Swiss-Prot record:
Protein name: Anoctamin-8
GO cellular component: endoplasmic reticulum lumen; plasma membrane
Compositionally biased spans, kind Basic and acidic residues: 14-23, 904-932, 1031-1043
UniProt keyword Kinase present: no
Key words, A-Z: Acetylation, Cell membrane, Membrane, Methylation, Phosphoprotein, Transmembrane, Transmembrane helix
Modified residues (N-acetylalanine): 2
Region (Disordered): 1-32, 524-650, 681-728, 888-970, 997-1152, 1174-1232
Bias kind Polar residues: ranges: 1078-1087
Chief location of this protein within or outside the cell: membrane
Similarity field: Belongs to the anoctamin family.
Membrane side Cytoplasmic: residue ranges: 266-281, 378-400, 459-750, 829-841
Membrane topology note: Multi-pass membrane protein
Organism: Homo sapiens (Human)
Disulfide bond positions: none
Amino acid sequence: MAEAASGAGGTSLEGERGKRPPPEGEPAAPASGVLDKLFGKRLLQAGRYLVSHKAWMKTVPTENCDVLMTFPDTTDDHTLLWLLNHIRVGIPELIVQVRHHRHTRAYAFFVTATYESLLRGADELGLRKAVKAEFGGGTRGFSCEEDFIYENVESELRFFTSQERQSIIRFWLQNLRAKQGEALHNVRFLEDQPIIPELAARGIIQQVFPVHEQRILNRLMKSWVQAVCENQPLDDICDYFGVKIAMYFAWLGFYTSAMVYPAVFGSVLYTFTEADQTSRDVSCVVFALFNVIWSTLFLEEWKRRGAELAYKWGTLDSPGEAVEEPRPQFRGVRRISPITRAEEFYYPPWKRLLFQLLVSLPLCLACLVCVFLLMLGCFQLQELVLSVKGLPRLARFLPKVMLALLVSVSAEGYKKLAIWLNDMENYRLESAYEKHLIIKVVLFQFVNSYLSLFYIGFYLKDMERLKEMLATLLITRQFLQNVREVLQPHLYRRLGRGELGLRAVWELARALLGLLSLRRPAPRRLEPQADEGGGGGSGGGGRRCLSGGCGAPEEEEEAALVERRRAGEGGEEGDGPPGGKEEDEDDEEEEDEEEEEDEEEGEEGGLLDCGLRLKKVSFAERGAGRRRPGPSPEALLEEGSPTMVEKGLEPGVFTLAEEDDEAEGAPGSPEREPPAILFRRAGGEGRDQGPDGGPDPEPGSNSDSTRRQRRQNRSSWIDPPEEEHSPQLTQAELESCMKKYEDTFQDYQEMFVQFGYVVLFSSAFPLAALCALVNNLIEIRSDAFKLCTGLQRPFGQRVESIGQWQKVMEAMGVLAIVVNCYLIGQCGQLQRLFPWLSPEAAIVSVVVLEHFALLLKYLIHVAIPDIPGWVAEEMAKLEYQRREAFKRHERQAQHRYQQQQRRRREEEERQRHAEHHARREHDSGGREEARAEGSGLDPATSSEKASAKAKGSTAGGHGPERPKRPGSLLAPNNVMKLKQIIPLQGKFLSSGATSSLAAAGAGATTRPPPAQSPTGSDTRLPAFLSFKFLKSPETRRDSERSHSPPKAFHAGKLFPFGGTRAEPGSNGAGGQARPDGTPSSGSSRVQRSGPVDEALAEELEAPRPEEEGSGTALAPVGAPALRTRRSRSPAPPPPMPLPRPPTPPAGCWQWDGPWGCGGEGAAPRQALAAAECPPCAMAGPPPAPQPLPGDASFYSLPPPPLPPTSDPLETPAPSPSPSPSPQAVCWPSGWH
């Protein structure tokens, strides 16, 4: 199961125990109360700027944590264990620690991963990384198979930035999906529905955010926030906050730089053209045309700049997701998707349309009417102020300032209304949701910000009044926005929301005055509250951390007091530390001041600890119940893993438990209730006696002995290493109290309104661009400061550009042409410059000027490409490389497919050949039986011969499944292979000199020498080679010599010539046949083996064309006409079976052996007598060839004379003749 442990990154007070979460029905302390208790009530609601900045410098960094997941304080153990188990099973790459934040009373999962797991996650995410120069440079998606080509892949610290690590972990968490039918309490998941977003939308998970990395953050503070006159470190911003935020600051910096031109030009015109009306009219027309050209150039140049940055950051050609995940907030009815055939939520479009028509549209119109009425009210108030005589000049701007304040306040209300309407319209995809939200907010902001200006310019037609209103709105709104952006993250109430009310301002002023006062009041005495179960025990619940580092103004005076209080903890209940009278006097002075705040907050003294209360995690040990000694703090940390695991325990079964408060209240008080889950060791020891298995410490006991007893009784617990007494807050708990950074939506919205002020009505007020320039210089640093100090760190997002805001600002540029041309024509500038123009001519001139400006804008848009040339070339290179890689991949895939097809065809061919071989064996066995029956032989003997033949054909092989030689060996395409053997017959027959053998019952006869095989282990050639292809050296023609192989040719590779019986004294070893007819196998007999020779030997057992096709037997010259051999039919039985001679007839090839009918190892057959084969038994040379009668065919060569032998049973020695003639072969039809 999951590894869970209390973390080592946080610190806790020794000897102190945090409070348990309140029981049901008791209100939980707000999460925002942590900082109130850290810094005392004097800074209550004073502002998050001072608070968080001071606490930030004194927090303990959280190590080995990339993403923090927090839960509400009411979360039960079952929910935590269920989610923890799903994370560990579904995402085994993650390392999760479980902790409990003491002050916020929130559970938290500290999530991180190892470097190897992050590499696999980068491959899954498709994260683009820089490639080494020797491999082509540039960037490409990460691949684990080619990890060696990426830069810094060897370094764990330099390869991944913290933002990339967090993005990979977020990708894993968002892809943790539920199975069919899974449910958690009342939350029922669909199949493959993301679990984490759904639980966050339901409020079960409070927040999921990445943790700041203080080392990099401090460097950013120096190079970005504090370096006002330097360029922004955009690459560092991208590496830390992601592409989306870096793209916003790049756009803001580019916009601010471009604002220099209209600011300078407008300031010059405003300075030198205020002398007379004509100069002002000329400057108005010229500046309007200048703004049209400038806005167009700015937008087009930003496209090019944005393309360069997107290419540099690897997002220019990032492919969009093919299937976008539904929003977690999307609701509907369950149905089966017609596309994926899976269960999904469905919301009918007609319901959304009905809501838009009946709710959204009326509310939007009502808001516009409210804006119009507020504007009219402010104008009436201004008319009233102007009608009063004797008021100062500044009083004239009070109604305008009030209108600007109302516009700013209304903008926030309209934004919340737009978000509510968008949520109620229930959009399924995030892109559709964001698109409609932008439309609503832009519509509200446009009407709310520009309605008064349009009213003055188009209806009142008063340029002077328009200039004053524009200056008031622009300056006031920019000032309020900067103040709100900087202070709102630091001004908060219990719920953590930023409010800028009068009470917050008053509290901030009081806090600042208190800090600046010369006399700093001493701290009041802390007494244990009676409602906590009381007693002046040494429990940590009734004490307050005052040892410094908390940020309270009186911490220096309290530090010494705490040390004295520690020494006197076990004293009498009524005794107090020295200095008590002084504290009582100070308390009387501050009693009236703080009484109201005490009633408001309802604080409990036990929650004022500054130490971090860690959730304890224990493992139930399986097996023997022997007590294990407590591990050392160093042994609790596994090497390479930030998760703490107890040595010797099995991390398979674990539970969570609340830790008892140490000496907190009486045993019967509500705060002294036993924990919900008690942990017992395997030996049966419980923890119901005290917080750590021991007795509760008495009030008078020493704290050192208590801590020692805790260490001794903590063998089954996983506690963090004991550290020095530190009241500092952990970084993770502090960041969980910060306000969440919503998005760049609010920042773009402010810049959109400012851009409209500059380009729409700048002809009336040329200094608007200068005011915007000054504001933007402050805006960059204030936004940077807000991100680095006052807000949670956002997850990095990869975007290609600024998105829809580019189109919105382009539409604003087109609208600016129309508005400025109308102002020039209707406000009198054109009539004063050209008094001779009639009203109709003036209108035509304005229309012509408008069309000319639109044409100029279009030409600039077309003339300037959106992507620079060098970026386009690099993109073309990447596209070419991508296509080549795709082609290479296709070729490899096709090659693999062809190999698979070839292997499959070979397997099918092998199976067919094996089936054919088995069928042929079956048919040959049937023919043998039929022949045996026709010849009068015993069928059992024939079956034995058939089985012996099968054994001989498979001898030395791997089984009977090997195919035999195909019958097409002598086909025309194989003639060339066979002809290569013909010129080598002299070599084959040179060592094959033989002596004659006497036939059985006959005298001494001379036998021709057998043929010598090319392998040297056989003295005979195959029968089908002896007649048709082999020729004597005298009859060879020169044309046949050209077919001789240039190198030594081993016929044994093509035909197996080994394994036959040779006569003694010949080159091949052999043995004589025994008198009983069985062949003798001598020790010198050569057994040929090997896959090639054996396979070819089996192939030679197949019928040959001469056997099956012609049906004609061959005979030597001078023999009588042979009987015609009929194919595939048994020969007629002979009149009388003759006894088989012990030795083969001279010159007869048909004997048991590799070239005989039975094969090597076959059962001996009864051979015919010498009279049955007269040509073979004749001694001496045969007569000249003569034609045979009938249709019998023959081929013979004159055999050489053989020396006579005295012993007919003696095997003749090989003849030394260098080139004897081949032997004649006799095939009796009855033998085959």
